[in-house]
Amino acid sequence: MMPVDDLQEIPLSKDTTEKSKHTVRAAGAVLWRDASEHGGTTGHPATVEVAVIHRPRYDDWSLPKGKLDQGETEPVAAAREIHEETGHTAVLGRRLGRVTYPIPQGTKRVWYWAAKSTGGDFSPNDEVDKLVWLPVDAAMDQLQYPDDRKVLRRFVKRPVDTKTVLVVRHGTAGRRSRYKGDDRKRPLDKRGRAQAEALVAQLMAFGATTLYAADRVRCHQTIEPLAQELDQLIHNEPLLTEEAYAADHKAARKRLLEIAGRPGNPVICTQGKVIPGLIEWWCERAKVRPETTGNRKGSTWVLSLSDGELVGADYLSPPDEK
């Protein structure tokens, strides 16, 4: 088991209820834009501006956030809430931790991400009547809630402008022992196909651009809906199968780094006996400690890179699991 990063694992505020009746899931973001055109280094914390919103209902200044809609994952909700509250589209990056606090219904749990604005215009609405873009120090003063300020401090603690590599374990595909044909051709089952469809919005929230899959039908099928959405081909990767990894893990590592070094945000879909070893090796190499670990079918590792170096590794459960 890889060590846990204390910075990310500890909730920003603790639930003080003895027994929660219900957990309300929500997601939010530090929405940022580059202000380097005014003089500075692109993506440096000192030259970015972050969005702080005013909600007339509460008369407060806070970060964009909101509850999940039915069937949504936290990353999808974060991207949607950003657009609804600020008018901006955005690409998610590093996960910044979670806030939990008691509410009358039980407990509210909010996961936050860094989110780079890709454009848009704010229009006042019933939920948000003002938006200001501020340097980090000024935003820290503007935010009213201590938890929001803690999230913002986490945002600037590590590189702001990052590239993302998305490593996906293929969706469910029945049991190997029950499949009579060539296991390389074993397809996704009904749940696996649903996972593949649900992964589209989640992977697009992180700006997925290029697609790679281990040489297995189920790996290709897992990202086929995304390939159709992006109108992209899926590159076949023989070096990233379980058998190839067991035979030559160094070749698989080299291939992973080659893909990560290419332009864009790649999605790499592979198998359950490949992912843990690759993630652990890269994290140890970069001295990155993931907040949580996992390897469920349909799950995703969101790997954040800055100047080619791994700076964050976030595990996301399958989209059909809470």
Swiss-Prot record:
Motif mapping: Nudix box: 66-87
Signal peptide: none
Disruption phenotype: 12-fold spontaneous mutation frequency increase by rifampicin resistance screening.
Amino acids binding Mg(2+) 1: K65, E85, E127
Enzyme Commission number(s) from the entry: 3.6.1.69, 3.6.1.58, 3.6.1.61
SMART domains: PGAM (SM00855)
Record: residues binding substrate: R55, P56, R57, Y58, D60, K65, G66, K67, Y101, K108, E127, Y145
PROSITE patterns: NUDIX, NUDIX_BOX
Region of interest (Disordered), residue spans: 1-21
An annotated GO BP: DNA repair
Domain of life: Bacteria
Domain Nudix hydrolase residue range list: 22-156
Alphabetic keyword roster: DNA damage, DNA repair, DNA replication, Hydrolase, Magnesium, Metal-binding
Top enzyme category: hydrolase
Alphabetical list of InterPro entries matching this protein: His_Pase_superF_clade-1, His_PPase_superfam, Nudix_hydrolase, NUDIX_hydrolase-like_dom_sf, NUDIX_hydrolase_CS, NUDIX_hydrolase_dom
Pfam families: His_Phos_1 (PF00300), NUDIX (PF00293)
One GO MF term attached to the UniProt entry: metal ion binding
Gene3D superfamilies listed in its UniProt record: Nucleoside Triphosphate Pyrophosphohydrolase, Phosphoglycerate mutase-like
Domain-level remarks: Contains an N-terminal Nudix hydrolase domain, followed by a linker region and a C-terminal histidine phosphatase domain. The C-terminal domain is necessary for efficient catalysis by the Nudix hydrolase domain.
Subunit structure: Forms head-to-tail homodimers.
Family per record: Belongs to the Nudix hydrolase family.
Function, in words: Catalyzes the conversion of 8-oxo-dGTP to 8-oxo-dGDP, and 8-oxo-GTP to 8-oxo-GDP. At high enzyme concentrations, can also catalyze the conversion of 8-oxo-dGDP to 8-oxo-dGMP, and 8-oxo-GDP to 8-oxo-GMP. In addition, catalyzes the hydrolysis of the diadenosine polyphosphates diadenosine hexaphosphate (Ap6A), diadenosine pentaphosphate (Ap5A) and diadenosine tetraphosphate (Ap4A).
PANTHER family registered for this protein in UniProt: 8-OXO-(D)GTP PHOSPHATASE (PTHR43222:SF9), NUDIX HYDROLASE 23 (PTHR43222)
Protein name: 8-oxo-(d)GTP phosphatase
Originating organism: Mycolicibacterium smegmatis (strain ATCC 700084 / mc(2)155) (Mycobacterium smegmatis)
